[in-house]
Amino acid sequence: MFAKALGADKVVGISRSHSKRDDVLKMGADDYIATEDDKDWNKKNRASLDLLICTVSSPKMPLVKYLQLLKTHGQLIQVGVPEDSLPGFNVFSLIMKGAKIGGSSIGNPRQIEDMLTLAAKKSIKPWIEQRPMRDANKAIVDMEDGKARYRYVLVNDQPKL
């Protein structure tokens, strides 16, 4: 949604399985890659992306294959924070393409304000699932089990005084 709002020509969603495909396309992506369901995904999509924003937080992510998706002078920006170090890769693959790896945090207050302004201007709405506050513990367990689609919002279920 934000990539399109910022003028991206083509947006590709990437996840392990096809389970999120329909949602990703509804959010505005033009294409979808399932890394565990399609064994040749990196060959089929080699050198097809200028920018890859990686939200993966697993040290088991297929980093070498992600780097193969980058075009010459492409960039991989890591925003997910793995619990351990990133997987190893051959630096030569970056040098030959002139590719870069970088990182980014959530942003400063001004950038967050700009993002919210853009969201309002382009009518970008979050995909959330409301959960009652009384089920907060269950929501945490469900979130850790990967059941959240895509953010849980805890709602106070106490009557207003």
What are these regions (language model features)?
Residues M1-D37:
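Mid-domain Rossmann-like dinucleotide-binding core that forms the NAD(H)/NADP(H) cofactor-binding site
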Residues I14-H18, T35, T55, G80, ...:
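N-terminal Rossmann-fold cofactor-binding loop
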Residues R16-D23, S85-V91, Q111-I112:
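Short, glycine/polar-rich helix-capping loops at beta-to-alpha or helix-loop-helix junctions
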Residues K43-D50:
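A short acidic, Gly/Pro-enriched loop at the edge of an enzyme's catalytic core
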Residues L52-I53, I77:
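N-terminal Rossmann-like NAD(P) cofactor-binding module of classical short-chain dehydrogenase/reductase
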Residues V64, P109-L161:
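C-terminal hydrophobic helical "lid"/dimerization subdomain
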Residues L70-T72:
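Helix-to-beta-strand junctions that scaffold the AdoMet/dcAdoMet cofactor pocket
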Residues Q75-I77, F89-E129:
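Rossmann-fold dehydrogenase core element
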